[in-house]
């Protein structure tokens, strides 16, 4: 079961990072301008962020395996569409389709893990989930660099998308045999009005985060944020009212009465604000500041992966020993890693030894491996099975919004520092200082989230 579920998780996470390596070659071949390039990246993220809440609820109502299979098939076809795209318009459409498919899969995978496993098996399942996410994130750039340099069958950048085809086909073949169907036990009614409201609100919130920095934060971005606030307010009021009238809201307000879930969502947003922006500024520093090729910069990422693999493969054992301190300890270890990286960047500069970055990268990877999967498990620990899909959709949305927010904020910090100093090392260190603050805030939130409860083998706080 885990192998099939993680195939989809791996593909969707990989495509977030691997596309960054493919962009230069893609732009040259398809004659894509800056706006088109931005949409190749942003179209995927926007579709995921706006679709996961609705997809989570659809899984509760109509079957999580069924929705996962639909998403997996659509993602595989969309990858084919991207891989054979004759022009930039088709490629952007394929990326949006990939995002919608990822939105279908992501909450179903989390919901199935949360309902199919209990006790230590549940902790191990979430450890595998975290390991898969981390490996895709950390090694995505390396995998992309290898594929492009290998230029298999003359496919070049297209192989970064076509690599999903055999993975998707195999997972689809095994899915009916290995993954049981599951669904919520609540009222089988679909909240159409709630779906429309939350989708519009997320578009209004995420679109300016994605495009605001490059556009110079024009008036429309601030008007969009204001519209998002109004739409979210209307959505919350409608959900509460619908629940009181005996209806079936898209997101049951009871979910947020659990302190673990509501505070955990905030922690997830802040955590992913740091993760998405860290990978971005590190790649910029290595490729633009040090002039490394995508493949060579991907090799540097192996240092993070080494640390991550050490702790993520034994995350449930660490949780059993450290209890409620597991995630806080992981985030504080990440702070230490970023501080070491800040010092190492001062020595590496633009022409010094890149090896000066390695100690900080390893320590950051160790902390990331300790924090990622136990944090997800903690947030979902108190969710009733009937709400598993909706809760997983909300959690996935928090991750996407955090990532978009992180990229927007780090863009302001990094590029302002770059403009002021003219040097990538200074801009990178300014970005790291921002990330250290983000991780300290994350540590404070997860300390509060622990709330004095001890984690056992199940990963519960």
Q: PLM features: what roles do these ranges have?
A:
Residues 1-173:
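Transmembrane-helix bundle of Major Facilitator Superfamily
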Residues 1-21, 30, 221-222, 231, ...:
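12-transmembrane solute porter fold
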Residues 25, 57, 61-62, 84, ...:
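Membrane-interface helix caps of multi-pass small-molecule transporters
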Residues 28-29, 35, 60-61, 83-86, ...:
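Membrane-helix boundary and inter-helical linker elements of multi-pass secondary transporters
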Residues 46-50, 80, 134, 138, ...:
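Hydrophobic/small/kink-forming positions within alpha-helical transmembrane segments
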Residues 74-84, 97, 101, 167-174, ...:
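Transmembrane-helix signature of multi-pass solute transporters
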Residues 107, 133, 137-145, 202, ...:
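Glycine/proline-centered helix-kink
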Residues 149-266, 274, 292-293, 299-300, ...:
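Hydrophobic transmembrane-helix bundles of small-molecule transporters
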């Amino acid at each position: 079961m885990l192998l099939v579920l993680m195939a989809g998780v791996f593909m969707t996470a990989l495509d977030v990072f691997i596309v960054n390596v493919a962009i230069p070659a893609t732009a040259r071949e398809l004659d894509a301008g800056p706006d088109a390039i931005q949409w190749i990246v942003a179209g995927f993220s926007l579709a995921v962020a706006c679709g996961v809440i609705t997809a989570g609820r659809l899984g509760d109502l109509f079957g999580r395996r069924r929705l996962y299979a639909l998403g997996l098939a659509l993602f595989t076809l969309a990858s084919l569409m991207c891989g054979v795209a004759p022009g930039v318009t088709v490629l952007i459409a394929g990326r949006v389709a990939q995002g919608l498919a990822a939105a279908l899969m992501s909450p179903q995978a989390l919901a199935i893990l949360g309902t199919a496993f209990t006790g230590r098996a549940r902790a191990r399942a979430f450890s595998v989930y975290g390991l898969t996410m981390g490996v895709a994130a950390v090694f995505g750039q390396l995998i992309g660099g290898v594929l492009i340099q290998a230029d298999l069958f003359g496919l070049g950048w297209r192989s970064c998308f076509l690599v999903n085809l055999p993975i998707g086909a195999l997972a689809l073949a095994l899915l009916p045999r290995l993954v049981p169907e599951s669904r919520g036990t609540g009222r089988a009614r679909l909240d159409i009005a709630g779906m429309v409201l939350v989708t519009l609100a997320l578009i209004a919130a995420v679109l300016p985060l994605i495009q605001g920095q490059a556009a110079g934060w024009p008036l429309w971005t601030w008007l969009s944020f204001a519209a998002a606030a109004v739409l979210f307010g209307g959505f919350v009021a409608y959900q509460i009212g619908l629940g009181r009238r005996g209806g079936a809201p898209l997101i049951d307000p009871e979910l947020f009465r659990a302190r673990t879930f509501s505070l955990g969502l905030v922690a997830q947003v802040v955590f992913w604000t740091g993760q998405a922006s860290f990978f971005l500024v590190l790649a910029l520093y290595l490729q633009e500041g040090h002039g490394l090729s995508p493949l060579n910069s991907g090799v540097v990422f192996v240092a993070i992966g080494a640390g991550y693999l050490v702790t993520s493969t034994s995350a449930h054992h660490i949780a059993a020993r450290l209890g409620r301190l597991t995630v806080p300890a992981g985030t504080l270890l990440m702070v230490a890693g970023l501080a070491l990286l800040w010092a190492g960047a001062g020595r590496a500069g633009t022409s010094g030894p890149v090896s000066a970055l390695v100690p900080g990268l390893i320590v950051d990877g160790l902390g990331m491996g300790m924090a990622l999967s136990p944090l997800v498990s903690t947030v979902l620990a108190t969710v009733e099975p009937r709400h598993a899909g909706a809760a997983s959709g909300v959690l996935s949305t928090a991750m996407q919004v955090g990532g978009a927010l992180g990229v927007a904020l780090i863009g302001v910090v990094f590029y302002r520092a770059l403009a002021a100093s003219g040097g990538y090392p200074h801009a990178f260190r300014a970005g790291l200082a921002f990330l250290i603050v983000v991780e300290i805030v994350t540590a404070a939130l997860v300390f509060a989230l622990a709330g004095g409860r001890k984690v056992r083998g199940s990963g519960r706080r």
